UniProtKB/Swiss-Prot annotation:
Upper classification of the organism: Bacteria, Pseudomonadati, Pseudomonadota, Gammaproteobacteria, Enterobacterales
Top-level taxon in the UniProt lineage: Bacteria
Entry protein name: Protein YhcC
Gene name of this polypeptide: yhcC
Domain Radical SAM core, first and last residues per copy: 17-254
Cofactor: how bound: Binds 1 [4Fe-4S] cluster. The cluster is coordinated with 3 cysteines and an exchangeable S-adenosyl-L-methionine.
Organism the protein comes from: Escherichia coli (strain K12)
Amino acid sequence: MQLQKLVNMFGGDLTRRYGQKVHKLTLHGGFSCPNRDGTIGRGGCTFCNVASFADEAQQHRSIAEQLAHQANLVNRAKRYLAYFQAYTSTFAEVQVLRSMYQQAVSQANIVGLCVGTRPDCVPDAVLDLLCEYKDQGYEVWLELGLQTAHDKTLHRINRGHDFACYQRTTQLARQRGLKVCSHLIVGLPGEGQAECLQTLERVVETGVDGIKLHPLHIVKGSIMAKAWEAGRLNGIELEDYTLTAGEMIRHTPPEVIYHRISASARRPTLLAPLWCENRWTGMVELDRYLNEHGVQGSALGRPWLPPTE
């Protein structure tokens, strides 16, 4: 694969800027979710089973222990980003967040923070806290779970916020100089390629620094799993994902960094689509598609040109 020559990928961007590989270490801060505990809603998003992306056992270790454990699993990098991934990693009092984030950046070879959260859980005090780390020279990314820009779909999947909320949070963060990475799902019920391209267009118009693309995973324990088991919902086919994600990438300005272009999960948590079991399948197909149809930005007449070494 030659994805770095076809897409402005985060890994390549980090290597160019730091002069060596930088790896994300995922952390569990013990946070909950306001869309599950009643603060905003109950039941959570219809696609969600946090076990599909988070090791719940991690929450019983300290931040330092988690980072040490994760670093031992990585032998290709010596510098790291601390990634608070599970649940809503800004859903706590600011002093609690400060303590956790400080524990993370205090560990050896940590060069930055990536904080995953909902767009309705980022008050000014949290943005100001993240700016403190940015101003100290740390790489800071605010990763916002948007999934789609269509309010009808957001309501259908029980997100508990609308697109305008995402826009407000993104604009406030970027006005402070914080980098924003938007998480988008391809294959949501009622959405096809046209809707996904509209979402991309609205995200780019709002202003964004990074994007994560994710095929819809139907996972055990989610509300969507019940619809799938009843035959009312199907997982996205690999061909459809490749076409839609490929066109989204081709319509993305070259300066926007792709943090991810596909995602995997393991059985028995993953119910469908089973091609998502293999982390490479989606990337290999997208590599082929972009080689045939054009690189990131090519549909805009602004093709991605990887920097020369």
